Amino acid sequence: MLAVRSLQHLSTVVLITAYGLVLVWYTVFGASPLHRCIYAVRPTGTNNDTALVWMKMNQTLLFLGAPTHPPNGGWRNHAHICYANLIAGRVVPFQVPPDAMNRRIMNVHEAVNCLETLWYTRVRLVVVGWFLYLAFVALHQRRCMFGVVSPAHKMVAPATYLLNYAGRIVSSVFLQYPYTKITRLLCELSVQRQNLVQLFETDPVTFLYHRPAIGVIVGCELMLRFVAVGLIVGTAFISRGACAITYPLFLTITTWCFVSTIGLTELYCILRRGPAPKNADKAAAPGRSKGLSGVCGRCCSIILSGIAVRLCYIAVVAGVVLVALHYEQEIQRRLFDV
């Protein structure tokens, strides 16, 4: 299970989540039915070589649409919703419209559902970026607890590993026998890791040359982070094409606000080098527990925090599943049906 301990990483996760929720809200509920689609039109009475013009639905104009089933099967996926607001061309009673009416009668040659484009490009990129960033956070936390970290004060003591406390409690309560193998293993790991960190800080190039696996792990961690942030920032630079006329100004402003905030937050986290705490040396050395109350307090706090985090995850996952099942048909109807 994943618990985001770093406030910097947590802020980025919250911003990405909020950005994705805003996009989903606009796609499902925020777009007006008259501003979901764009149409490639040509005024009635003009030559066939006249260039097509993309425009959104305008109630002051008369849009003559294609038949119910286009002869060449040229409709795009989910574009049928765009033809619901059109008038079939064969039911128009007049033969040749007057010149004054030509500018108000449009023949529709193609329709595009812009919500489909938004759903399958931006929303998907945000979701993929969100999962990649969570994968980066998971790898980073595991490396801080068990791997090589520089500077050394960023290391997390392996003894705080939840499995260590859980194994100790289970063995002492149910088995009535002290189990210390995990504790000894973590202590040995802590000593070896401190030696590796000293070697890495002395000569990083030689260290990574003789231990390429560590370099690969760190490289994968950095790649996940940069790819995730790149996908999120890239959503603001995706070409909207002709669909730009349907998207409101607030969506553009909201997109750039979220993207710039996420990018600046990550840049600040990367460039910022916080000073080492004054008691870093004391904290690095293993200290003795101050009596039974200190041991019980540490055990209870870590176990209860782990249980609370797992309960929160279960509640969030269950809530998302229930909401998705309850509103699945409604979401599909709003997106792709009439």
Swiss-Prot record:
Extent of the signal sequence: 1-30
Post-translational modification: N-glycosylated.
Region (Involved in fusion): 31-121
Compartments where found: Host cell membrane; Host endosome membrane; Host Golgi apparatus membrane
InterPro entries xref list: GK
Glycosylation: residue positions: N48, N58
Family designation: Belongs to the alphaherpesvirinae glycoprotein K family.
Protein name: Envelope glycoprotein K
Residue intervals on the Cytoplasmic side: 141-212, 265-301
Gene symbol of the encoding locus: gK
Membrane topology: Multi-pass membrane protein
Its job: Glycoprotein that probably modulates membrane fusion events during secondary envelopment of cytoplasmic capsids that bud into specific trans-Golgi network (TGN)-derived membranes. Also plays a role, together with gB, in virus-induced cell-to-cell fusion (syncytia formation). Seems to block fusion of virions with infected-cell membranes.
